[in-house]
UniProtKB/Swiss-Prot annotation:
Its EC number is 2.7.4.6. Belongs to the NDK family. GO terms for cellular component: cytoplasm. It comes from Saccharolobus islandicus (strain L.S.2.15 / Lassen #1). Pfam families: NDK. GO terms for biological process: CTP biosynthetic process; GTP biosynthetic process; UTP biosynthetic process. The lineage of its organism: Archaea, Thermoproteota, Thermoprotei, Sulfolobales, Sulfolobaceae. This is Nucleoside diphosphate kinase. It catalyses: a 2'-deoxyribonucleoside 5'-diphosphate + ATP = a 2'-deoxyribonucleoside 5'-triphosphate + ADP; a ribonucleoside 5'-diphosphate + ATP = a ribonucleoside 5'-triphosphate + ADP. One of its GO terms (molecular function) is nucleoside diphosphate kinase activity. HAMAP family: NDP_kinase. InterPro entries: NDK-like_dom (IPR034907), NDK-like_dom_sf (IPR036850), Nucleoside_diP_kinase (IPR001564), Nucleoside_diP_kinase_AS (IPR023005). SMART domains: NDK.
Length: 138
């Protein structure tokens, strides 16, 4: 196994609904380490950078407005094969496709209010971490 770090963000609906502790607890029970954590109100500029790959898509504006609508909790999480482990733990973007026992399967309300974001590759994780954390935070 290879020790990796990834970026995870609890979205405004997860924060508003009081799911922060439950979500973090799931990661810790899985043996993953929270390296850094902060609650922020994301600027539009950062949101556009975070979701840059979706620029030009029909849902881009709604997504940016949503993630800037309230506080989010940003985390850097470390563990063996952590990118894939967390992707499996959070489940499909569409909660109808996310099995029970996954974070989205248990808590997501819709495709847009789906509680959580997690990087889907090491490269994206590094880019996304750098949007929210300085090297000294890690």
């Amino acid at each position: 196994m290879v020790m990796q770090r990834t970026f995870v963000m609890i979205k405004p609906d997860g924060v508003k609904r009081g799911l922060i502790g439950e979500i973090i607890s799931r990661f810790e029970k899985r043996g993953l380490k929270i390296v850094s954590l902060k609650m922020v109100k994301m600027s539009r500029d950062i949101a556009e950078k975070l979701y840059d790959e979706h620029k030009g898509k029909s849902f881009f504006e709604e997504l940016v407005n949503y993630v800037t609508s309230g506080p989010v909790v940003c985390m850097v999480i470390e563990g063996d094969d952590v990118v894939q482990v967390i992707r499996r733990m959070i489940g499909n973007t569409d909660p109808k496709e996310a099995p029970p026992g996954t974070i989205r399967g248990d808590y997501a309300l819709s495709k847009s209010e789906n509680v959580i974001h997690a990087s889907d590759s090491i490269e994206k994780a590094q880019r996304e971490m750098s949007l929210f954390f300085d090297k000294s935070d890690l």
